[in-house]
Amino acid sequence: MEVLRRSSVFAAEVMEVFDRSPTDKELVSQAKALCRDYINSRLIRAGVSWSKPEHNTPVPGGKLAEVSAILLRLGDELEYIRPNVYRNIARQLNISLHSETVVTDAFLAVAAQIFTAGITWGKVVSLYAVAAGLAVDCVRHAQPAMVHTIVDCLGEFVRKTLVTWLKRRGGWADITKCVVSTDPSLRSHWLVAAVCSFGHFLKAIFFVLLPER
């Protein structure tokens, strides 16, 4: 799908900014590129990719590729621990995938609740896992255009909520510390933080299901 190939347009620019302090706009662009890559990986894994990757389609390289690989690796661990949380997202939220407004509101509600008690890399990984799970649901229900909506929503959430936090850590490359550190407490920290976010995720489901008054 074209939405997943658009990352190639600015791939070189996204990779270049890892060598200096990134701007807000660059961090958001990187977030969306990482989201497309994460979603594409999960679509392929679920066997619901709607088109075969073209041979001439560029893939992320350099540090961006490293960040993407680590994000997917941590996502694998998170989804292994709580597989039911990141599957059938639309059914858990009891939402229609035919309305862009409904999908947008539901995703942003879940995202906001995940980060209610603060920001950690574990929660960031959880956010991407939710986005990918919802994207898989959309494609399975013949709504592939919603993938672009989800990517944009994640980018907007990053802009409003995570950019300052990311800049303090020097950008997305900071996530590599989750796997290269020899301190076991650092590695377990992101897992504990993500597990704690499960409660917020379920709370978000409750709020989304509340009828309007």
From Swiss-Prot:
Instruction: Please tell me which stretches of this chain the record labels as motif BH4.
Output: 32-44
PROSITE patterns (UniProt xref): BCL2_FAMILY (PS50062)
* Lineage: superkingdom: Eukaryota
Name its GO BP terms in alphabetical order: extrinsic apoptotic signaling pathway in absence of ligand; intrinsic apoptotic signaling pathway in response to DNA damage; positive regulation of apoptotic process; release of cytochrome c from mitochondria
Task: Identify the InterPro entries for this entry.
Answer: Bcl-2-like_sf, Bcl-2_BH1-3, Bcl-2_fam, Bcl2-like
Q: Name one GO cellular component term.
A: mitochondrial outer membrane
Question: Where do transmembrane segments lie in this chain?
Answer: 190-210
Q: Which GO terms describe its molecular function?
A: channel activity
Where found, per UniProt? Membrane
Which Gene3D superfamilies does the UniProt record give?
Blc2-like
Membrane protein topology class: Single-pass membrane protein
* Ranges spanned by the short sequence motif BH2, renumbered to the chain: 165-179
Q: Where is this motif: BH1?
A: 113-132
| Motif placement: BH3 | 67-83
Alphabetical UniProt keywords: Apoptosis, Membrane, Transmembrane, Transmembrane helix
Which CDD domains does the UniProt entry name for this protein?
Bcl-2_like (cd06845)
User: What is the purpose of this protein?
Assistant: May play a role in apoptosis.
| Family, per entry | Belongs to the Bcl-2 family.
Q: Any idea what this protein is called? A: Bcl-2-related ovarian killer protein
Designated gene of the protein: BOK
